[in-house]
Amino acid sequence: MTLKTALQYFGRDFEFPNSIAGLPDKLSDVEGLEIGSFKTNDGVSLSYWKAGKGIPLVFVPGWSSNGAEYINLIHILKQDYEVYVLDQRNHGLSDKVTFGNRISRFSADLNDFFTALDIEKAHLCGWSMGCSVIWSYIDLYGDQKIEKLAFIDEAPSIYCHSDWTEEERIKSGAFTISAEAMISMYYGKGPSNRLAVNTDIHDFYTVVGAPAFENSHSLYEQFVPPDMAALELVLFDHIMNDWRDIFLYKIKRPTLVVSGEHSNWVESQRWIAETVPDGKALIFAKNENGDHFLHLKEPLKFSSQLKAFLQA
């Protein structure tokens, strides 16, 4: 296991394009930021971003994301927590491999992360596919190491079965009838339509009107650009999972479910919060950048709400 300061790792500082009160102006403003790595039990080197002291708060990013996009959240939350952001296999600074590209293996990686860093208890916060990784982790390893849970805008089932009622589709958040069509749309490989893939998520993947997201995304593009070929390998498995039973039978910890009025599956987020034993829904309004990228666009508001939940 290795650990370097962020400036040692990247070899230089980085200045963000926008100066925003309460957020870093440059990478070196995130005091104590370190980049570490560890080996999984199948020999893959995974990286993580770390700063702060206190109860561990572990972020599991969504598909294609990594610690660079979380730089603002790290800066804010390190005042109260030992903050970690895990770069999953084929993501960010972690190894790019052609094996183990399924959600169950990603959750095993999360378990290996807890073991390697000797973390006995932590808050867990997942976003998008990162939620699925946590759901799989709970399914396979239980919740003994979890204090509280937070989930950001992930549908319980992306894939819609042809024999589901409309009520089932809405509660599951399903928005595609073809994993292949969804992957093709994500990669711009061919035409799509609302029947095959019903989402406008890409319309909101923009830094326009979101200077905080422009800052974190600029670090992401400069230092940790995505390997799109490697990222594609996990998508089919990710799309085809149905996690609804996890909320019905497995999750017992206090749970915050965060979404926005722009989300195509916001009703499924309300369903999760209503279904788990101790759940709470937090819905960002449209004028609060209430879309799939809300925590990156509004890091100050999101961090404040997350802290209030964790400290309650």
PLM regions: where:
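Conserved serine/cysteine hydrolase catalytic core
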Residues: F223-E274
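Conserved HGGG/HGGXW glycine-rich cap/lid loop of the alpha/beta-hydrolase fold
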Residues: V44-K96
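Flexible "cap/lid" loop of the alpha/beta hydrolase fold
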Residues: I146-G188
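Conserved hydrolase catalytic core segment
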Residues: E120-D163
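Catalytic active-site module of serine/aspartate enzymes centered on a nucleophile-bearing elbow/loop
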Residues: G279-A312
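Alpha/beta-hydrolase fold catalytic core
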Residues: M1-L57, D80-Y81, I119-E120, E147, ...
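Active-site loop/oxyanion-hole signature of alpha/beta-hydrolase fold enzymes
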Residues: N41, W49, V85-M129, L140, ...
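Alpha/beta-hydrolase active-site loop signature
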Residues: S64, Q88-G92, C131, P156, ...
